[in-house]
Amino acid sequence: MAATQYYGTGRRKTSTARVFAKVGTGNIIVNKLPLDEYFGRETSRMVVRQPLELVEMTEKLDIMVTVKGGGNTGQAGAIRHGITRALMELDESLRPSLRAAGFVTRDARKVERKKVGLRKARRKPQFSKR
């Protein structure tokens, strides 16, 4: 192993995560807080751990994350994407299994903009026939 640290950038909705992975004991630090403190919801924590559990490296890597923008779901998705990219930098042979699980592809869904004359992006004003 030439590099001691592996990097991956992850994005989801309006969130961007910078992920640094190195060989260690399995600590995940998000914005200088432990994962369990940063995310209150168990689903968010589960989403972050998914790629590590898939390749069975939960206890083998220390992960340091800086994440900005968006809300909980977007940030968790961005971290997952970043961890996936860092894992692929660590070992390219993990790519097929990560792709099969759907972690490699960037989720391009974003909030649709509100249009003029409508109440929301697609919600039309109530129609009264008479």
Curated annotation (Swiss-Prot):
Pfam families: Ribosomal_S9 (PF00380)
NCBIfam families, per the entry: PRK00132.1
Family: Belongs to the universal ribosomal protein uS9 family.
This protein's record includes keyword Ribosomal protein: yes
Disulfide bond sites: none
CC terms in the record's Gene Ontology section: cytosolic small ribosomal subunit
InterPro entries: Ribosomal_Su5_D2-typ_SF (IPR020568), Ribosomal_uS9 (IPR000754), Ribosomal_uS9_bac/plastid (IPR023035), Ribosomal_uS9_CS (IPR020574), Ribsml_uS5_D2-typ_fold_subgr (IPR014721)
MF (Gene Ontology): RNA binding; structural constituent of ribosome
Organism: Shewanella pealeana (strain ATCC 700345 / ANG-SQ1)
Keywords: Ribonucleoprotein, Ribosomal protein
GO biological process: translation
Phylogenetic classification of the source organism: Bacteria, Pseudomonadati, Pseudomonadota, Gammaproteobacteria, Alteromonadales
This protein's name: Small ribosomal subunit protein uS9
Superkingdom per UniProt: Bacteria
PANTHER family (alphabetical): RIBOSOMAL PROTEIN S9, SMALL RIBOSOMAL SUBUNIT PROTEIN US9M
